[in-house]
């Protein structure tokens, strides 16, 4: 059998990207608008006391990863699609502008590229369309992927595929970030969360995403703006990049102030192992300039 030279191949095989506040800046205002819509939904549709809503909204987000997951865990009953439509349907998407620089950067990457987000598929489609990034990703792992409704079909008209799954995630020891949110059934291979929604920063959500995307976590980089998500991703075995931060938090291998800085901070995405070694050698042993004489 002929041996295969792996030195000319990139170090990484897949790049997983969070979407909101990662592919675009927090300063867009969508995050704040989304929070206001959630608070309004809690007040108008769930009858929660107005004075309790702001703190409750934030506390549930911190505890469960999303306010929606927290509300479900507390026993509030509502339709998932209706909730997403209320929260995202009125967002000021016009504040998002095409990002040709990021588009060029993404298209230049030789690896598979997949979105991994807690958001629903309609929101994903709107955001990627506004940013002009519809054809930059192979697929999307979204809310419906990890929490499939009775009827969930792939949508291919967007230029990317919404990934689906019927896998069962085997339980592993969860990080301290999410231990308190899960019941592990000893008699079964299936891990059943107390909350009826599977989402980041659950380590199981990352394990599910790894299986759905069919990737090797040791050869996959995960980009996210959330320190909790980064910590969970590291527990799941992924390489991690915190986006929008100046400090390398626990679990982060690299911190970027902006997603636009990927090439400077992570040249190995574009370089093969052989090219990276050559570049490092040049830095360690720069060529010595030779003085030449010109006779005229």
Which residues does each PLM region occupy?
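Asp-based, Mg2+/Mn2+-dependent phosphohydrolase catalytic module
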Residues: 1-12, 107, 121-296
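Conserved short hydrophobic patches within well-ordered secondary structure
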Residues: 34, 38, 42, 116, ...
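Short, surface-exposed alpha-helical recognition segments that flank or form part
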Residues: 29, 93-97, 115, 193-201
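Short, flexible active-site loop motifs that bind/organize anionic cofactors or intermediates
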Residues: 43, 73, 92, 114, ...
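Structural motif corresponding to alpha-helix initiation and N-cap regions
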Residues: 99-103, 203
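N-terminal helical cap/lid subdomain that shapes the substrate entry/recognition surface
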Residues: 2-17, 22-100, 111, 120-122
């Amino acid at each position: 059998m002929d041996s295969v030279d792996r030195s000319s191949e990139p170090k990484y095989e897949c790049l997983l990207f969070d979407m909101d506040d990662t592919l675009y800046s927090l300063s867009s205002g969508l995050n704040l608008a989304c929070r206001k819509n959630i608070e309004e939904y809690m007040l108008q549709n769930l009858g929660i006391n107005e004075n309790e809503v702001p703190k409750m909204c934030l506390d549930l987000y911190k505890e469960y990863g999303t306010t929606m997951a927290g509300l479900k865990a507390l026993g509030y009953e509502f339709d998932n699609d209706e909730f997403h439509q209320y929260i995202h349907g009125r967002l000021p998407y016009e504040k998002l502008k095409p990002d040709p620089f990021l588009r060029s950067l993404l298209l230049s990457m030789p690896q598979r590229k997949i979105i991994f987000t807690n958001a629903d598929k309609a929101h994903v489609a709107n955001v990627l369309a506004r940013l002009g990034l519809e054809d930059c990703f192979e697929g999307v792992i979204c809310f419906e992927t990890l929490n499939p409704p009775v009827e969930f079909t792939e949508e291919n008209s967007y230029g990317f595929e919404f990934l689906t799954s019927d896998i069962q995630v085997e339980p592993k020891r969860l990080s301290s970030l999410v231990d308190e949110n899960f019941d592990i059934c000893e008699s079964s291979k299936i891990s059943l969360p107390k909350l009826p929604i599977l989402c980041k920063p659950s380590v199981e959500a990352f394990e599910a995403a790894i299986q759905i995307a069919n990737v090797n976590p040791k050869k996959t980089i995960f980009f996210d703006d959330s320190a909790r998500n980064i910590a969970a991703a590291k527990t799941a075995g992924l390489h991690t990049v915190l986006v929008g931060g100046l400090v390398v938090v626990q679990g982060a291998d690299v911190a970027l102030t902006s997603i636009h800085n990927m090439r400077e901070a992570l040249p190995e995405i574009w370089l093969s192992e052989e090219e990276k070694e050559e570049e490092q050698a040049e830095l360690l042993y720069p060529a010595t300039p030779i003085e030449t004489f010109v006779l005229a």
